[in-house]
């Protein structure tokens, strides 16, 4: 199904089927769900499409999208696709400076936002010289669209290789980059998701990462808007999420490991199960096998999965909690990395020698079990970044007219063809001795220590000497200096049990690790390294 025509076709097939359920809370224990059918969603998209077209927004115009998740986001995105304008999606939690830099790089012609973004308009006008029009979706404008009966009668260009959307990366180990997707790539992405997970038209999805809600209308699924602030996911109230799962009979849910930790803690404390869930996806950062098991125990009729991918390439691989616990967990505990499963159908994965240099030819693959750089190729992998030639040269390899994407990750393939993740390339530590330390492999050793909540491998420099160091976030931070010293000595002794970590000599404690805003789970190891380098 073409993403452009999806709403129209789904509305014709399932006109009264709920497309969106929006929570409206009245007090702590009283929530009502406003329901919008696919037929109503189609009408909203048609009216807004016609209005935007009448405002001069046309084929190929880049449009900066600044609306909250839910009804407004879905209607706006599909309206822009309908007139073949290019929605530009930037993470609202990355901070004003990063946001403005992303907007400036994109060079959008139009901004469409909610009333709350008015405070940013002066900054945007100064930073983004290409902006010619700013449209605020006020209540009065929405009312006007409802009552005036706009009719959408737009010419369809139907060029599948035209730009369809720009989605920015989180920039957790660099700077945010705008991945450009064509209609052909978006269509292929939807087909890959459907083939891998067999979503059914009567299913209900609760996406804790807003961008994933955009696939639901195309997959004929109902979207339940979560009660949370997407720019501050750590403020999530797990009680509200569990209530939504039960009230709306949610069958599908996506969330980061940190958010799932909140949900699992809540469910276990209240002895609550989640029987309606068929699938729970944990992604956005490496997932501890014990968390996978905890979530699986909450789903008597469902499966827990951890997919692997990136903003530029999703999905790449996937593994179930059951396979992790039965086949790969023991190797992870021994420092073997995290298994992220078999590549999805029609996805090619290759492990190549590690290098920081741009590549103009496709390197030969490394042998099985050899750690190297992960590169991937699929019909839905984004091939370019918007207005960023240096990033394109660094992240893309063109071979025989086919574009491979360098994931920026390190890992290896095992004898069965499964992919194992060993960490980000930018975060591995190369010691003066030449030995390479991988974050995912080393941290697994320390994360098994009873006193440790999580750990981070960082590069520590003293003069011309580079060595690995481990930062520990304890479950309970000792208050007294004496107790901190005892804990660090215990951690140092713990490191001696494994060949991977026995020669690490620097250890630090940190109360709260800095993490990314999008998933609230990816550790900012480079930021930690800068912090301890200054001490």
Predicted regions and their residues:
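Structural core segment of the AMP-binding/adenylate-forming
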Residues: 82-145, 474-480, 493
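Conserved AMP-binding A3 loop
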Residues: 35-39, 164-191, 222
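Conserved C-terminal "lid"/linker of ANL adenylate-forming enzymes
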Residues: 456-461, 469-470, 492-535
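Conserved pre-ATP/AMP-binding loop-to-beta segment of ANL
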Residues: 15-18, 149-171, 175, 198-204
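Gly/Ser/Thr-rich phosphate-binding loop
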Residues: 221, 252-254, 265-335, 348
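Conserved AMP-binding/adenylation subdomain of ANL enzymes
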Residues: 86, 187-204, 209-252, 266
């Amino acid at each position: 199904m073409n993403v452009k025509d999806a709403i129209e076709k789904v509305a014709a097939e399932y006109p009264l089927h709920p497309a969106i359920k929006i929570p409206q809370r009245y007090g702590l224990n009283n929530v009502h769900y406003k329901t919008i059918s696919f037929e109503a969603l189609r009408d909203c998209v048609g009216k807004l499409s016609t209005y935007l077209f009448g405002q001069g927004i046309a084929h190929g115009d880049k449009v900066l999208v600044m609306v909250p998740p839910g009804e407004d986001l879905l209607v706006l995105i599909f309206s822009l696709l309908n007139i073949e304008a290019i929605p530009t999606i930037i993470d609202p939690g990355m901070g004003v400076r990063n946001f403005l830099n992303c907007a400036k790089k994109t060079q959008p012609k139009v901004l469409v936002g909610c009333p709350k973004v008015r405070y940013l308009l002066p900054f945007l006008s100064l930073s983004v010289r290409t902006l010619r029009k700013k449209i605020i979706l006020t209540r009065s404008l929405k009312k006007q669209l409802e009552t005036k009966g706009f009719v959408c009668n737009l010419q369809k260009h139907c060029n599948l290789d035209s730009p369809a959307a720009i989605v920015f990366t989180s920039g957790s180990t660099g700077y945010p980059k705008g991945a450009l997707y064509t209609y052909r790539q978006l269509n292929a992405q939807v087909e890959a998701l459907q083939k891998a997970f067999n979503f059914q038209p009567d299913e209900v999805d609760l996406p804790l990462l807003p961008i994933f809600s955009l696939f639901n209308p195309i997959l004929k699924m109902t979207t339940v808007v979560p009660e949370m602030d997407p720019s501050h996911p750590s403020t999530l109230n797990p009680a509200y999420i569990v209530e939504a799962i039960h009230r709306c009979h949610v069958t599908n849910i996506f969330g980061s490991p940190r958010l799932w930790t909140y949900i699992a803690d809540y469910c276990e404390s209240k002895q609550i199960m989640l029987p309606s869930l068929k699938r729970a996806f944990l992604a956005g950062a490496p997932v501890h096998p014990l968390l996978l098991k905890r979530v699986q125990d909450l789903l008597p009729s469902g499966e827990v999965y951890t997919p692997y991918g990136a903003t530029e390439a999703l999905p790449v691989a996937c593994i179930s909690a059951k396979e992790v616990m039965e086949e790969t967990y023991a190797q992870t505990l021994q420092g073997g990395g995290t298994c992220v499963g078999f590549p999805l159908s029609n996805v090619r994965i290759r492990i190549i020698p590690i290098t920081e240099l741009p590549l103009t030819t496709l390197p030969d693959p490394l042998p099985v079990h050899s750690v190297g750089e992960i590169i991937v190729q699929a019909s839905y992998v984004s091939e370019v970044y918007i207005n960023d030639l240096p990033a394109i040269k660094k992240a893309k390899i063109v071979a025989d007219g086919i574009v491979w994407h360098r994931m920026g990750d390190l890992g290896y393939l095992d004898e069965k063809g499964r992919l194992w993740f060993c960490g980000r390339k930018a975060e591995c530590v190369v010691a003066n001795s030449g030995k390479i330390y991988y974050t995912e492999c080393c941290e697994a050793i320390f994360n098994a220590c009873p006193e440790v909540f999580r750990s981070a491998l960082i590069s520590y420099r003293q003069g011309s000497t580079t060595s690995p160091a481990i930062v520990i976030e304890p479950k309970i931070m000792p208050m007294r200096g004496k107790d901190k010293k005892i804990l660090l000595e215990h951690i140092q002794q713990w490191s001696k049990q494994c060949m991977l970590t026995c020669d690490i000599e620097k250890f630090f404690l940190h109360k709260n690790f800095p993490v990314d805003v999008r998933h609230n789970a990816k550790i900012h190891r480079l930021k930690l390294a800068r912090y301890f380098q200054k001490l």
